[in-house]
Amino acid sequence: MEENIINGKVIAEDITSTLAVCINDLKVQHNVTPCLIVILVGDDPASHLYVRNKQRKAEMLGLRSETMLLPSTTSESSLIDTIRRLNNDDSVHGILVQLPVPKHIDKNLIINTIDPRKDVDGFHNENVGRLFTGQKKDCLIPCTPRGCLYLIKTVTRNLSGSDAVVIGRSNIVGKPMACLLLGENCTVTTVHSATRNLPDYCSKADVLVAAVGIPHFVKSSWIKPGAIVIDVGINAIEEGGVKKFVGDVDFSEARNIASAITPVPGGVGPMTIAFLMVNTVIAACNQAGIENFVEKYLDL
């Protein structure tokens, strides 16, 4: 059933190739070159890999991008000073602090030090508040949930009246994902570690989004036949002495039940980076007073 697999890698490449044209036109027509600064504190190997991927994609698209590597001993006050300097630099349009940060640094304080107009992760309280109060056009939306919704809408444009279940309640994925689905007029249920009879909720979902970080947590028996299944999880496991990455959904069985399903890897992951680039260009346009420029190129 290859035809029911949602190829996030191909879809993300379509988005970024269109975005590259948008960026070039933005430069030519408005003399604006979007600029993204990524701040990485410490030496976490996974974080360094993520940041390299973001940097590579930004450069491919014609964005101006820079990674600031700071030692793990960087003080909270020093990091705040760095962010404030970038906030005041009109040539910088997007600021991203790669998470996690060292334990001596208050993550929420750092996120909310970023100018909300430059908060391309969409985590600042102001952006969160606007999203939750239905002001989607006036905020930067978290990249992973935005990418998930885009994938869902490649399967069906009309979600109105659909029953949607989001497994997970994180601020990064679960909560904003539920909010975006509400905005599409879905009836949304959020389930989590304390939910009783969790499979019963899942089995009623027309749209099921799994974001719990537990390998193969969602069984095929939980899935409603014909459901759209979006697997946000990316979990490292060892199988026969070989390290591999799997999702939160038991993909091998679930693919036979779902009408459409994302694989891991190659599903949601590429969309997260694609929408980070989209958010950076939107932020640049907003700061330059250019309205609805990206929307001329991408159906957002």
Curated annotation (Swiss-Prot):
Keywords: Amino-acid biosynthesis, Histidine biosynthesis, Hydrolase, Methionine biosynthesis, Multifunctional enzyme, NADP, One-carbon metabolism, Oxidoreductase, Purine biosynthesis
Source superkingdom: Bacteria
GO CC terms of this entry: cytosol
Catalytic activity: (6R)-5,10-methylene-5,6,7,8-tetrahydrofolate + NADP(+) = (6R)-5,10-methenyltetrahydrofolate + NADPH; (6R)-5,10-methenyltetrahydrofolate + H2O = (6R)-10-formyltetrahydrofolate + H(+)
EC number: 1.5.1.5, 3.5.4.9
Biochemical pathway: One-carbon metabolism; tetrahydrofolate interconversion
GO MF annotations in UniProt: methenyltetrahydrofolate cyclohydrolase activity; methylenetetrahydrofolate dehydrogenase (NADP+) activity
InterPro entries per the UniProt record, alphabetical: Aminoacid_DH-like_N_sf, NAD(P)-bd_dom_sf, THF_DH/CycHdrlase, THF_DH/CycHdrlase_cat_dom, THF_DH/CycHdrlase_CS, THF_DH/CycHdrlase_NAD-bd_dom
GO process terms (BP): L-histidine biosynthetic process; methionine biosynthetic process; purine nucleotide biosynthetic process; tetrahydrofolate interconversion
Binding site for NADP(+): G168, R169, S170, S193, I234
Subunit structure: Homodimer.
Similarity comment text for this entry: Belongs to the tetrahydrofolate dehydrogenase/cyclohydrolase family.
Task performed by this protein: Catalyzes the oxidation of 5,10-methylenetetrahydrofolate to 5,10-methenyltetrahydrofolate and then the hydrolysis of 5,10-methenyltetrahydrofolate to 10-formyltetrahydrofolate.
Protein name: Bifunctional protein FolD
Organism field: Ehrlichia chaffeensis (strain ATCC CRL-10679 / Arkansas)
Gene coding for it: folD
